[in-house]
Swiss-Prot record:
Upper taxonomic lineage: Eukaryota, Viridiplantae, Streptophyta, Embryophyta, Tracheophyta
SUPFAM superfamilies (UniProt xref): Protein kinase-like (PK-like)
Membrane spanning stretches: none
This protein's name: Mitogen-activated protein kinase 10
PANTHER family: MITOGEN-ACTIVATED PROTEIN KINASE
Gene Ontology cellular-component annotations: cytoplasm; nucleus
UniProt region (Disordered), positions on chain: 394-481
UniProt cross-references to InterPro entries, sorted A to Z: Kinase-like_dom_sf (IPR011009), MAP_kinase (IPR050117), MAP_kinase_CS (IPR003527), Prot_kinase_dom (IPR000719), Protein_kinase_ATP_BS (IPR017441)
Post-translational modification Phosphotyrosine, affected residues: 189
Length: 611
């Protein structure tokens, strides 16, 4: 039991690699494999729903494969319909620039129509009718969006035990625009031959229509009725022979409209064949079903009905109402601009990343506003909160909150000790007057420079650490600006010590400096004490220091508001504070001197409040 559990955990780790949403899904079993990757069944621990997760690996190895994946996820986002498989989620990759795999979360379907046909020999006429109804209803929605599926076959139609069907696999689909060159539109057509319309087998026409999908639906419906493929051709010529064996040779009018000279000559030279009665080919089928099937399998595409016209056929009386079957708005050219120009792998990667963000609304908003991050390997605490809020937004405010994972980049900031002295830097004279608290809180942390009368300067801070690379642990060092820190990802600001309420005594730092010949600080003479006092006062008020300075005027916390006063009042108040705390400052100077003697600089971090 434990061995199975460990094996399952190992499988999950191998399946998800570094993707952060992995904890949301509990892998059950592998339900499919192919050249694209692997499909696993899983449970969404947030909703309890069963899903199928399709891992597509190395998607950018071949640009044609990447374009096919982009096309499919884009179309499935745009074509939302009960009879079309739904993408529920796409996991956010660990890096925007370097990801190679994607994880697409679908609703879980138990089987496909190919398996249903093979395993069930007891399907009823009601099954046949309901199956065809769902397929035509989905096709109506697809075609009203000006989309041709181009690869309809039983394996691309998912099925559940409750007879629910859903069309999937839009990798070969295309959006038809009036100005799309036909030669480009069909150059990569490699759909399964058995379900391919005759005009595609022989390149009969230069302009193709949605009738190619109608033909495929007819072939699928005939296979449902008989349990075996209708036209299992071994090659294109054999395929055309099988078609004409059932339907008869096409009329001279149809042949005359064939644009391809070779195909036209072949059809003209074909011996005359009479069509076979469908009632003879399908003896146990409903006559209305056969009447509709014969229309779906018309050799000439202009004789085939549209999906909407087929739904209005008497075969669906009492089941379908054309006016209530949904239609889709035509898809705009902008969505598929990449199909009309030469694109690189980097272009496709960016477009796929943009599609992934459609399932992460908050990050999509940042992306559109130009404030997105380029890597998501090590999220900070703020990123974790954003993830929780995005989860609640995506789930309509329902469902449990994602637990906060403790990441090394969100650990508390520790004291940074430099092994070499920090170069002398100019110390800012910041901090508002401490005579009385202000009744008006200010929102801009830069305003205290105006209150104090000082020009903006850069406060002393630890030297900036290079940006962390994936896999390298580097503590967080925020950029400093005028005593405030700013998160590069968030518009909110962190203000350091922008205000300080009146108090009796300022924080003190204690140290001991031993003068040669003296055992301790307590043995200093009055003159030596006075000298140290003067040094401390000079250090506290000077603009520069020679080695290391601890600005004890900066408290370890601050309030959101600060008093407003002129510089003379502020100076008087600070002078009084320094006079009362002269002994403490002397000890501070002694500590500074000791630190300088040891050549070790200690940079204290005060707590700050986010707003």
């Amino acid at each position: 039991m434990q061995q199975d559990q460990r094996k399952k955990s190992s499988t999950e780790a191998d399946f998800f690699t570094e993707y952060g949403d992995a904890s949301r899904y509990k892998i059950q079993e592998v339900i499919g494999k192919g050249s694209y990757g692997v499909v696993c069944s899983a449970i969404d621990v947030h909703t309890g729903e069963k899903v199928a997760i399709k891992k597509i690996h190395d998607i950018f190895e071949h640009i044609s494969d990447a374009a096919r994946i982009l096309r499919e996820i884009k179309l499935l986002r745009l074509l939302r319909h009960p009879d079309i498989v739904e993408i529920k989620h796409i996991m956010l990759p660990p890096s925007r620039r370097d990801f190679k795999d994607i994880y697409v979360v679908f609703e879980l379907m138990e089987s496909d129509l190919h398996q249903v046909i093979k395993a069930n020999d007891d399907l009823t006429k009601e099954h046949y009718q309901f199956f065809l109804y769902q397929l035509l209803r989905a096709l109506k929605y697809i075609h009203t969006a000006n989309v041709y599926h181009r690869d309809l076959k039983p394996k691309n139609i998912l099925a559940n035990s409750n007879c629910k069907l859903k069309i999937c696999d839009f990798g070969l689909a295309r959006v038809a625009f009036n100005d799309t060159p036909t030669t480009i539109f069909w150059t990569d057509y490699v759909a399964t031959r058995w379900y391919r319309a005759p005009e595609l087998c022989g390149s009969f026409f230069s302009k193709y229509t949605p009738a190619i999908d109608i033909w495929s639906i007819g072939c699928i419906f005939a296979e449902v009725l008989t349990g075996k493929p209708l036209f299992p051709g071994k090659n294109v010529v054999h395929q055309l022979d099988l078609m004409t064996d059932l339907l008869g040779t096409p009329s001279m009018d149809t042949i005359s409209r064939v644009r391809n000279d070779k195909a036209r000559r072949y059809l003209s030279s074909m011996r005359k064949k009479e069509p076979i009665l469908f009632s003879q080919k399908f003896p146990s089928a409903d006559p209305l079903a056969l009447d509709l099937l014969q229309k779906l399998l018309a050799f000439d595409p202009k004789d085939r009905p549209t999906a909407e016209e087929a739904l209005a056929h008497p075969y669906f009386k009492g089941l379908a109402k054309v006016e209530r079957e949904p239609s889709c708005q035509p898809i705009t050219k902008m969505e598929f601009e990449f199909e009309r120009r030469r694109v690189t792998k980097e272009d496709i990667r960016e477009l796929i990343f943009r599609e992934i963000l459609e399932y992460h609304p908050q990050l999509l908003k940042d992306y559109i506003n130009g404030t997105e991050r380029t890597t998501f390997l090590y999220p900070s605490a703020v990123d974790q909160f954003r993830k929780q809020f995005a989860h609640l937004e995506e789930n309509g405010g329902n469902g449990p909150v994602i637990p906060m994972d403790r990441k090394h980049t969100s650990l508390p900031r520790s004291t940074i000790v430099h092994s070499t002295p920090i170069p002398a830097k100019e110390q800012p004279r910041i901090g508002p007057s401490r005579d009385k608290p202000s009744d008006e809180p200010y929102s801009n942390p830069r305003e205290f420079d105006r209150f104090s009368g000082n020009a903006p300067r850069t406060s002393q801070a630890p030297q900036r650490v290079p940006t962390a690379r994936p896999g390298r642990v580097v503590g967080p060092v925020l950029p400093y600006e005028n005593g405030a820190t700013k998160d590069s990802y968030d518009a909110r600001r962190l203000a350091m010590n922008s205000g300080y309420p009146p108090q009796q005594q300022i924080p003190q730092a204690y140290g001991y400096y031993q003068i040669p010949g003296k055992s301790a600080c307590s043995e200093l003479s009055q003159a030596e004490r006075y000298t140290l006092h003067q040094q401390a006062y000079t250090c506290a008020n000077s603009a520069t220091v020679t080695d290391v300075a601890l600005d004890m005027r900066a408290p370890p916390f601050h309030l959101s508001g600060g008093p407003k006063s002129d510089s003379s009042e502020r100076l008087a108040a600070e002078t009084n504070l320094y006079t009362r705390s002269l002994n403490g400052l002397a000890a501070t100077a002694a500590g500074v001197a000791a630190s300088a003697h040891r050549k070790v600089g200690v940079v204290p971090y005060g707590m700050s409040r986010m707003y």
